[in-house]
Every structure is written in C-alpha cells, then in structure tokens.
Amino acid sequence: LLSTVTATGNAGFLGTVRVSGNTSLEGQLQLTESAAAAVHTTAINGVTSVSLNFGIAQNFLTTVTAAHTLARPTNARVGQVGSIFLVQSGGSGAISYNGCFKFPGGTAPTFATSNGAVSRIDYIVASISSDNTGENIHAIMTQEYA
C-alpha cells in the first residue's frame, strides 16, 4: 500500500507491519499476550558535547569516559518522554547539563563515579523553542544501578 490508508472499526494484522512516515492513532492501542513495544536506543559514545536528536529516539545510551555536556536536544516534541542511560567508565567521567534540563530543587545531580556504575536520567519535554530544541525538560536522575 503506497498511499493513504484508513481503517475504520477493528483492524487486525498478522506478521510484521512496518509503518514509515507520519502515523496518527485515535482511540486505544492495546498490546496483548506476549506483545511488547520497544523503543530504539541510540549510542552517543565518544562525544564531549552531546546534542541528542529526540526525533530519532526516546532512549539514549552513552559510556562516560571524560567530561560530557548534555546540550539542548534537537527535534524535541512537547510531552515526549524517555531515558538517558549513562555508564561510568573508570570513574573519571563527569556530566554537566545545559540549562534546559530542570532538576528537582533546581540543582543538577552529580554523576556516580564508581567504575561501571549506571545512572539513568528520566525526562519529559515541557516546552520547546521555535527551532524545536528543548527549552524546558523536566528531569530526574537515579543512580548506581548494578
């Protein structure tokens, strides 16, 4: 099918269904039995200033080997949620944050320094600027996952 498709009522699909382009859903999407939804994870290793592209993924992973700065993400959408996984390598890595990241109490968290420590920043985009970069991103970090 290479054009607009509208399904009214109940629709079922067996096998693999790939949708590209804009997709709109009205009503409910229900996953049953052994179904699962997975979100693409993007590696961002080896970059000191990281501007995540929120248009290609919601979840991100990086190994922190030096001083990294989380810059303003591009292609953000209001209401978008996700996680940024940070893995400490050697204990010398550090994270700083662009001012668009808003943490509880107004204080950015300190990144765990134990070798192999995993920290997770969960976020929701509260507002964006006119160029679709994140303007206010509410974030919280949990640390020291083993």
Label each PLM-derived region with a short phrase.
Residues 1, 9, 110-112, 129:
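Serine/threonine-rich low-complexity intrinsically disordered regions
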Residues 71-72, 108-112:
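Beta-strand-rich interaction surfaces with strong enrichment in secreted/lumenal proteins
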Residues 1-33:
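Register-specific beta-strand positions within repetitive beta-rich fiber domains
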Residues 23-103, 116-118, 124-146:
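Exposed extracellular interaction/assembly regions and N-terminal maturation sites
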